[in-house]
Amino acid sequence: MKKLLYSLIFGAVCLASCSEQYLVSGSSNVEGLEGKMLYLRVFKDDDMLAIDSSRVVHGRFKFRGIMDSVMMANVFLESNSVMPVVLESGDVNVRIDENFQSATGTPLNDSLTNFIHRKSQIDARIAELPHLEFQMISNGVDHEQVLAELGEQARELEMENDKLITRFIRANYNNVLGPGVFMIMTSGFQYPILNPQIEEIISQAPPYFKNHPYVKEYMKAAESNMEKLRQY
């Protein structure tokens, strides 16, 4: 009986030591989140599976659990994704504000937040273009000239945005950030497609990236869609 008890205790200790713990401590000043339930979801079996939940109380929430390996997750409010976060060993600090979200405190989260901040700056410059167009026209600038100048700016910003995403994914081919950002990038498409940016990313990707469940499923669907388009 004692041997059995020792075996059970040893097995429990081994299981705990073989798994890693994650702790995500969050805060928010968004009034609409107070009292709401947030969900932590990960991609599994072609779906976003909830693995934890936490209610926002006095602007605070917390996720805590055990994981077998580092995972890319998303914080959800109902069916809407609020922000991505990496579940890795260590204490992760999440901040949700009206205009910016961040996850810091661990290496991969720091890297992800820095990337999102840089991308947000480019997105803000793109969003400013219609306002610049209105200003230039109001100042009497020829409309054709306005379209030419702002069109060039838009193309340059789109190229800068694509390069930022591609370089970040390539720099993180062998960890969860690569497939995770690829999933974020392609989730905005109406349906899976292949374009020069995706082809460049895939052409140089190692097996770890290509065999990620989401990447693998996306490429299968995209190649099928492109084949159908070629038949028309």
Regions found by a protein language model. Give the residues of each.
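Charged, long alpha-helical assembly modules
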Residues: 170-232
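A non-transmembrane, solvent-exposed segment enriched in polar/low-complexity residues
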Residues: 18-162
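Bacterial Sec-dependent N-terminal signal peptides
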Residues: 1-28
